Every structure is written in structure tokens, then in C-alpha cells.
Regions:
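Nucleotidyltransferase catalytic core that binds NTPs
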Residues: 1-137
């Protein structure tokens, strides 16, 4: 079964910390790929400074396999909700194992996210601490 990591964020801008997390999770958990998913409009903070096109270009220029750019939230438009993205990706990749990658700070706020209880039903969550320790829960 193909294992896909899902790593969302504003990526405004993408930086070495983002790339390091994605690569280390891919290596440590033997993922086939990690999809970097830039949000269109975060539900919990202000609009990114860089435009969607600029952020897509920055990400595209910064990554290589096994990292993959996925513009689903930007293409969908409006406010980005993780649960909507997970529902779409579960339908798009029904035979794959999806693992959502979160920083520990985001994990602790997860209960406040839109339809948080559904997120736990749709995916396993990989929590990465600030020092890049990888933990699958």
C-alpha cells in the first residue's frame, strides 16, 4: 500500500525547516511521498503576504522527490479547511495510507479546528516536535 504524507501550511515563505521536516518524516516512516499543500486562506490567521502563485513557485523551486507540490487548497479557493482536503484526498487515493504531518504546536490546537473529530477518523497524525523528532500516533 502506498504511504503518503500530507504536510499543509502557508509556506510564506517555504524554508529549510519545512523541507527538513518533510524529508525526515518521509525517510523515518518510509513514505512514498510527502505532499506539500499550501493553504489558500488559513482559517486561523491572516492571509499570507505572498500571493498563491508566488508561494507555489517558491515551493516548486525548493523541493524534489519524494516531496510533491499539491495545490488542491489553492485551486479550491476560499478558506482552507483540513477536513475538506482530507475528504478529497481519501476519495482521490482510496487505496493509499494517508498520514497528516503536524508540528507539535499545531497538534495541541487541533481540537479547535473545523470538524476536528472528523480529522481523526480520516487520517493518522504524525507529530513533529521542534527538534524534528518524529512520532506517529
Amino acid at each position: 500500500m502506498k504511504r503518503i504524507g500530507l504536510f499543509g501550511g502557508t509556506f510564506d515563505p517555504i524554508h529549510n525547516g519545512h523541507i527538513r521536516i518533510a524529508v525526515e518524516v518521509a525517510e523515518n516512516l518510509q513514505l512514498d511521498e510527502v505532499r506539500l499543500i499550501p493553504v489558500n486562506q488559513p482559517s486561523h490567521r491572516s492571509r499570507p503576504i505572498a500571493s498563491a502563485a508566488q508561494r507555489l513557485e517558491m515551493i516548486s523551486s525548493a523541493i524534489k522527490v519524494p516531496l510533491v507540490l499539491d495545490d488542491i487548497e489553492i485551486q479550491r479557493g476560499g478558506t482552507s479547511f483540513t477536513v475538506d482536503t482530507l475528504n478529497y484526498l481519501k476519495a482521490e487515493y482510496p487505496s493509499c495510507s494517508l498520514l497528516m504531518i503536524l508540528g507539535d504546536d499545531a497538534f495541541w490546537s487541533l481540537k479547535t479546528w473545523h470538524k476536528a473529530e472528523d480529522i481523526f477518523k480520516l487520517t493518522n497524525i504524525v507529530v513533529v516536535s521542534r527538534d524534528c523528532d518524529v512520532k506517529e500516533r
